[in-house]
Amino acid sequence: MTQTLSQLENSGAFIERHIGPDAAQQQEMLNAVGAQSLNALTGQIVPKDIQLATPPQVGAPATEYAALAELKAIASRNKRFTSYIGMGYTAVQLPPVILRNMLENPGWYTAYTPYQPEVSQGRLEALLNFQQVTLDLTGLDMASASLLDEATAAAEAMAMAKRVSKLKNANRFFVASDVHPQTLDVVRTRAETFGFEVIVDDAQKVLDHQDVFGVLLQQVGTTGEIHDYTTLISELKSRKIVVSVAADIMALVLLTAPGKQGADIVFGSAQRFGVPMGYGGPHAAFFAAKDEYKRSMPGRIIGVSKDAAGNTALRMAMQTREQHIRREKANSNICTSQVLLANIASLYAVYHGPVGLKRIANRIHRLTDILAAGLQQKGLKLRHAHYFDTLCVEVADKAGVLTRAEAAEINLRSDILNAVGITLDETTTRENVMQLFSVLLGDNHGLDIDTLDKDVAHDSRSIQPAMLRDDEILTHPVFNRYHSETEMMRYMHSLERKDLALNQAMIPLGSCTMKLNAAAEMIPITWPEFAELHPFCPPEQAEGYQQMIAQLADWLVKLTGYDAVCMQPNSGAQGEYAGLLAIRHYHESRNEGHRDICLIPASAHGTNPASAHMAGMQVVVVACDKNGNIDLTDLRAKAEQAGDNLSCIMVTYPSTHGVYEETIREVCEVVHQFGGQVYLDGANMNAQVGITSPGFIGADVSHLNLHKTFCIPHGGGGPGMGPIGVKAHLAPFVPGHSVVQIEGMLTRQGAVSAAPFGSASILPISWMYIRMMGAEGLKKASQVAILNANYIASRLQDAFPVLYTGRDGRVAHECILDIRPLKEETGISELDIAKRLIDYGFHAPTMSFPVAGTLMVEPTESESKVELDRFIDAMLAIRAEIDQVKAGVWPLEDNPLVNAPHIQNELVAEWAHPYSREVAVFPAGVADKYWPTVKRLDDVYGDRNLFCSCVPISEYQ
């Protein structure tokens, strides 16, 4: 035998599973681009002064099986107590048909945000269903397709209230004293940067306060009390005060819709509809508002439109509100939402339907009534007479009760003076209620569930008659058909087939890093040890989570060159916001709070200026030179002009133009010279890992898109994770939390997310990726990502000019193809090429970002040479088709490009085009055919005729 045992053990086996091209394919591509090796190619492209001498020490790679075993041992340290803590988080029963066919299905979780609606009709339909659930339960006119979490939704509601308020001089926002504490925490953080004063008081005292533009009430208070705010809301509306109401989605099944009571905005968490607690997330928030406020709403909105043939089709509506277009004037900086989680909640509602949901809600309420009756029968007092699922129980021996609860492996809410909180949920059984009787009353309580049930069934007064819903919900056919598992399975599959995800083809979106989300990485997120923990459980019950998070943070520190990492931000946009707040608070700590100017290159992603605006900064744009790099002369001039008011610069590296700028260190030095901080956007970290690092380059803070570089899937538009890495001087200024002390962080800052560790339950994905790749694999992944991009650029540059290149004519991990000359010559646009790619079985590259009239391509390291060649061949074939238009063979108004994409129905319809059906749907011998279900969307029609609820089922099936 010539191989050693170590070689046969092959601990680095996963590296070859993750990286698409094998060694032979890599060498072929290296030959094609004129480089001898990966190291030689990297050496040519990356500036020498920022190349790391040694790779970060994150350990050797592990096999999939070894890594899973190691993580399972860590997860086993978590203690799975039954949690009745509530506070917006409850245990759930995720229907197995949804678990298997959506959450564990790459056809759903590997898709991208539906910017290309023709390849996204399935999840757009599921999101439209989510909006319909929201509309029915809230009683309002317009709903979004999810926000990041309930607390973030509250902050967005405050910001929206100010935007639509007619009280322009009012600057105070009132929050009822019984909202969830984590909600208040995030609202306060946002209010500080906007300059709003937050008033917290009993809701009935709101009218005592002057100069209030908006009010936040909670329909079911944090300790369980149901409020009838009808009269109060009417009085507030008479004073032109915008009213927002936080609501419990399961309670809304039984309770009066806040919209019917006059609320302007209603929001809450959809977690109870089938999404595990997961130590805090990810969870989708729902958000609804009156129709008159629709253009001021944050987040995605799915609308019903028409395609080119006049058929009903769905799309993301009113995108001109969003950050990628309006930049600092956007309604919100949100880029990622929580699509996968919203779709789970949506399908939970479809599967159970109105009858099933009412049964679940009534069962929860009945068990709560039984628990209340038994406790009161034995002399215990309840703080509130009206409740849905949560009791606030006064106890004389609170310490004894909590001790008995711990012995029974039960968590009660313990932060209420002289009382405990108990929140029941859909997993609660009669046996659980008997156990709670024993904890609160002792084992000899003598209570009987059936006897108590008869009592409360005939005389339940715990929901005020005026608060009981009197209208029907979820009457649309989609919520009343798919209740057998067979029907549900087929419905979900029919939606999946309409979409294009990574399980069918590469998604070469520039700046999005649509790499492999390996099965081994995904497996741990459904382990009950991770899925079932309450985010506010005692820390000793979450030792496994703490170990995993600490280890992941340590690896990220080493990979970024920073000194600390904060895991709280639950999206890249939230990470930007948190990082900028750290800079702001750092300056304030040095009595330099006047520093509020943020320099942003003209090429920046739209979230950058939107986040800067949210952080209370003024945006000053820095020009780029003819090569697409930051103009150093303009940078110096702008920095000098800002002077003592310079707060920071936000820069992406490699640049959004797909180039390693040679002067990046000089950029950092100029900003530091004038007292500013350097925020390095982590969007393109996939071209840095193992090769260089933000800290080594000279940056002070970055967010990391774990849903790009570190393999968390995009989920069709979320979830994401955007933890921030910081240098030591900024560490005291990262987000904290009002409920949970974050170990190792000395920060006293407010929170940016509802949960202390953001979407903690998806962090195992990134842990697994780093553990299986090791230092060697991570560097190689970056190098192959660079190789793949240069291979595409070199093969396509004669057909489609590459707009920007660096030294030696190379690109980084992505390249921009300039379509503008072709459009001038032929009239064929980047949009036509993008839609024609669908006929070839591909998702389009990023269109018109960062430069209008271009396509930005990022292949990632996970795509094999075979797939790259398939894409290249498709692009070259499209170029040949453009030449046919140029030569007059096909007219500009009727050719395969302007009519793309083509659908199956066209094959059997009358055919009057100057090209054949075969050219239309099987171009260049396409073998593995993806069939879109709609033709090109009519965007103008969709925005002019905004309709954001379910249409008759016959129209989109």
UniProtKB/Swiss-Prot annotation:
Cofactor dependence: pyridoxal 5'-phosphate
Swiss-Prot/TrEMBL keywords: Oxidoreductase, Pyridoxal phosphate
EC number assigned by the record: 1.4.4.2
Catalytic activity: N(6)-[(R)-lipoyl]-L-lysyl-[glycine-cleavage complex H protein] + glycine + H(+) = N(6)-[(R)-S(8)-aminomethyldihydrolipoyl]-L-lysyl-[glycine-cleavage complex H protein] + CO2
N6-(pyridoxal phosphate)lysine PTM positions: K708
CDD domains on file: GDC-P
Cited Pfam families: GcvP2_C, GDC-P
Gene Ontology BP terms: glycine decarboxylation via glycine cleavage system
Molecular function terms, GO-annotated: glycine binding; glycine dehydrogenase (decarboxylating) activity; pyridoxal phosphate binding
Cellular component GO terms held in the UniProt record: cytosol; glycine cleavage complex
InterPro entries listed in its UniProt record: GcvP, GDC-P_C, GDC-P_N, GDC_P, PyrdxlP-dep_Trfase, PyrdxlP-dep_Trfase_major, PyrdxlP-dep_Trfase_small
Family recorded in the similarity comment: Belongs to the GcvP family.
Entry function: The glycine cleavage system catalyzes the degradation of glycine. The P protein binds the alpha-amino group of glycine through its pyridoxal phosphate cofactor; CO(2) is released and the remaining methylamine moiety is then transferred to the lipoamide cofactor of the H protein.
Assembly information from the UniProt record: The glycine cleavage system is composed of four proteins: P, T, L and H.
Protein name: Glycine dehydrogenase (decarboxylating)
Species this protein is from: Escherichia coli O9:H4 (strain HS)
Gene transcribed to yield this protein: gcvP
